[in-house]
């Protein structure tokens, strides 16, 4: 009986370990970050963060900050092929940027982007150029 219990406990531990490893494996890993403020892409600054998953799948999160709010773009891609995208627009509910906190930001637009759209592809390529080729080759190709 103790052997059966021991075997059952071993199987359960192994199963939960595999599930944990699988869920950890499927998460995005931050591999690159860049402040784009010096490029003057928006009035109050901007930045991008590149995340990678297995099999060359990457996601680029780009934030543009303005005086009245911020825009957040998210692009998923493999190599240089855009596979998905989204755009969220937030407005600050206070007059001064120094007073902005998480509870003082309101989501005013949440849209999926069409990865086949020429305009979306152009926006993606315009930002994609700020990630060094060696980083893209290592994680996204």
Q: What residue ranges belong to the model's regions?
A:
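Short, linear, compositionally biased motifs with a strong N-terminal bias
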Residues: 10-13
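N-terminal secretory signal peptides
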Residues: 22-74
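Aromatic-rich beta-strand edge motifs centered on tyrosine
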Residues: 51, 75-77, 111-113
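Mid-chain, structured segments of secreted extracytoplasmic proteins
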Residues: 63-103
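C-terminal partner/receptor-binding element of secreted or periplasmic proteins
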Residues: 105-141
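Bacterial N-terminal signal peptides that target proteins for export
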Residues: 1-8
């Amino acid at each position: 009986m103790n052997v059966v219990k021991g075997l059952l406990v071993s199987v359960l531990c192994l199963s939960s370990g595999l599930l944990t490893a699988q869920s950890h494996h499927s998460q995005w890993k931050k591999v690159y970050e860049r402040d784009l403020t010096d490029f003057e892409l928006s009035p109050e600054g901007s930045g991008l963060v590149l995340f990678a998953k297995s099999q060359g799948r990457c996601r680029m999160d780009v934030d543009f900050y303005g005086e009245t709010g911020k825009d957040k773009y998210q692009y998923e891609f493999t190599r240089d092929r855009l596979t998905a995208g989204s755009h969220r627009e937030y407005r600050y509910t206070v007059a001064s940027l120094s007073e902005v906190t998480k509870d003082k930001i309101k989501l005013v637009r949440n849209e999926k982007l069409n990865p086949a759209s020429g305009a979306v592809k152009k926006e993606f390529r315009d930002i994609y150029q700020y990630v060094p080729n060696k980083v893209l080759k290592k994680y996204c190709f």
